[in-house]
Amino acid sequence: MADNTLKEKTSKGLFWGAVSHGTTQVLNLLFGIFLARKLTKADYGILAVISIFTLVAGCIQSAGFSQALANMKKPTHNDYNAVFWFNILAGSAMYGVLFLCAPLIAMFFHQPILVEVSRFTFLAFLISAFGIVPNAYLWINLRNRELAIANFFGLVISGCTGIWMAYHGFAYWSLAWQQVIYITVVNIIRYYYTRWIPTLPVDFSPIRRMFKFSVKLLITNILTTINQKVLTFVFGRIFHIDTVGVYNQADKWNATGSSFISNTINQVAQPVLAAVNDDEQREKRVFRKMTRFTAFLSFPAMFGLAMVGHEFIVITITDYWVSCVPLLQILSIGGAFLPFYILHQNMAISHGRSDLYLYCTIGQIIVQLGIILLFSHWGITTMVIAYSIFTILYLFVWQIVTSPLSHITIWQSLKDILPFLFIAACCMGGTYMTTRSITSLPLLLAVRIIVAASLYFLVLRLLHAEILNECLQFAKNKIKKN
């Protein structure tokens, strides 16, 4: 009974997570097309170079307490309340520091306009401090339907505002306002669904209990954020702001695809793994199924993006951005492996081993920085190739480190991953070769998507792939219920 209940909650969580992040990516795609057609490379570059500061500050204010709450069997109001007030204090302090540092940031990147833009954009993480607890409550209880609705309305309202501002000459300010409005709307809707209200006085003793676990996550999350944005940061220092904008555009579309799978998995991974970590065999079954599901989605999506990258960019955001296509294709290959990182990270966290998460991330950053410095004189394309190859290879390190927790060998992981990798690669390669003669870009894009998706589906059906059959059965059950 417990297995069935967990399976049902996991299926619902994955379904609504997929709906939420699928909708998010579609809306981001639509709004991104309109904005990229109006804004310049420099506009995107300006917001890109300060994104690392916003994300790091966001990590500091949340301090890993959302994951700490998820590891509790039944967190109380006192636990949530302590985390809320800590987030407010940390967020306010961080905003004050960054507000004062804005002139230094502008000086570092040789962009005086960053003073005003950064001070306004940094409001986004201050506002987000108010929504961390409601978000954690919905996430812990696998209420992904409500999270999906909040994200939908946040994207629609902020996206429409950004487009209106872009078409009325506000340039990079349209991107800044889009970020601030999005998090404001999302927070309001999260509070509507949770009806959670902070109280005074506040008892910070839960923070002290969670601190040992959370501080390692805090450091790890900061390092992970730096790791994800280090290329943008380095490029912002050594290349022209237009080049940063080109890379940012490629990275944005790559992240749109990769984060759909990563965020869908992340919605359920830690709560589910934490629920079964006292049963070794059950946990092993759950983890391997999540691995197969990730491979089933990630490889066709990301290899497909690499295949259609040229026609997709030219059709959607015009040939003004065609220089980002090679970078997008390279990043997409490496991006296919990033969702597996999420699984291993959540395995470590669900066992309370945030130290493993920390050490792996530190090692990743050290090697990655070395690679960037080594290839920095070879140009942006070579740096991105080296970065993507390293991303693929470092997955083996995560597998080795988490193996004592999951009791899953490298060979077992390869058996779960490689079939989908080879099938997706062959389907995309075959589609690419057989459609090269089509000269119309819109027709080429449509034909490649249809042929590749159909071919992938047919091959999996012929091979009786269990994960495909389960997805189809779940879809049938949802249709019958409705």
Predicted regions and their residues:
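Transmembrane helical elements of multi-pass membrane transporters/channels
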Residues: 13-28, 175-182, 186, 190, ...
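Membrane-proximal transmembrane or re-entrant/amphipathic helices at the cytosolic face
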Residues: 2, 403, 408-410, 417, ...
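Membrane-interface junctions at transmembrane-helix termini in multi-pass inner-membrane proteins
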Residues: 7, 11, 68-77, 127-150, ...
